[in-house]
Swiss-Prot record:
Reactions that this protein is recorded to catalyse: 2-C-methyl-D-erythritol 4-phosphate + CTP + H(+) = 4-CDP-2-C-methyl-D-erythritol + diphosphate
Site features described as Transition state stabilizer, chain residue numbers: R15, K22
CDD domains: CDP-ME_synthetase
Cited Gene3D superfamilies: Spore Coat Polysaccharide Biosynthesis Protein SpsA, Chain A
Key words, A-Z: Isoprene biosynthesis, Nucleotidyltransferase, Transferase
Annotated metabolic or biological route of this protein: Isoprenoid biosynthesis; isopentenyl diphosphate biosynthesis via DXP pathway; isopentenyl diphosphate from 1-deoxy-D-xylulose 5-phosphate: step 2/6
Cited function: Catalyzes the formation of 4-diphosphocytidyl-2-C-methyl-D-erythritol from CTP and 2-C-methyl-D-erythritol 4-phosphate (MEP).
Family: Belongs to the IspD/TarI cytidylyltransferase family. IspD subfamily.
Pfam families tied to this protein: IspD
Name of the protein in its database record: 2-C-methyl-D-erythritol 4-phosphate cytidylyltransferase
Molecular function terms from GO: 2-C-methyl-D-erythritol 4-phosphate cytidylyltransferase activity
Chain positions of site Positions MEP for the nucleophilic attack: R151, K205
Length: 219
């Protein structure tokens, strides 16, 4: 079955306090985004990789690829107004039938095992997302203040989120709403159940300077 991945990288680095978009910040001597693409190429040499970038960042990305002699083959699609529209633009380059994953460009530490697990389970379940346990205590805000909730009833969601191509294309044919916070929420809006797979704790989303320090330590 043909497999593809859409890697979404539309960050502007605001929480980093940097003028350089977070996906381009260096970790271990090269941009975060290059580590991410390499993780998926290691998973499958034939995997179709589609990188979604804002148009105004694409020339800079090409420059970085030349400077770092980056040779992982990939297509580039234009970023959209929101993540929803960016994924939709990437999907336009994916042909059915097959499986397609959607991954955050600033999650470079996803393991091969998690990638493989999500794609394999998607062959059976059609919609799969990686999750990890909540280890912190959670509180629910109420009109009266707040209250403790059982963390065993919650999971932290990661990427790649993997789906049948036809299913995800149909889901992204829906009208956008702010409640679409990830691809699973878009699919669930059609009443399709989403299967949970075990993720990896190191698969953090690099969005703050502290995350960069963690990333450097992981390398």
């Amino acid at each position: 079955m043909k497999q593809s991945v859409i890697i979404v990288a539309g960050g502007k680095g605001l929480r980093m306090g940097s003028d350089l978009p977070k996906q381009f910040l260096p970790v271990g001597g090269k941009p975060v985004l290059m580590h991410t693409l390499e993780a998926f190429r290691k998973y499958d040499a034939m995997l179709q990789i589609i990188l979604v970038l804002p148009r105004e960042q694409q020339d800079f990305w090409k420059q970085l690829c030349e400077e770092h002699h980056f040779s992982v083959e990939h297509l580039v699609a234009d970023g959209g107004e929101t993540r929803f529209h960016s994924v939709k633009n990437g999907l336009a380059l994916v042909q059915a039938p097959g499986l397609v994953g959607v991954h955050d460009g600033v999650r470079p530490f996803v393991t091969l095992e998690v990638i493989r697990r999500c794609y394999e389970l998607a062959e059976q379940h059609k919609a799969v997302i990686p999750v990890v346990d909540v280890v912190e205590t959670l509180r629910h805000l109420t009109d009266a203040g707040s209250e403790t909730v059982s963390r065993t009833e919650y999971k932290l969601v990661q990427t790649p989120q993997v789906f049948e191509v036809e299913l995800l294309k149909q889901a992204y044919g829906q009208e956008f709403t702010p409640f679409f916070t990830d691809d699973a929420s878009v699919v669930e809006a059609m009443g399709v159940p989403v299967h949970l797979a075990e993720g990896n704790r190191e698969n953090i989303k690099i969005t703050t300077p502290f995350d960069l320090k963690i990333g450097s330590a992981l390398l």
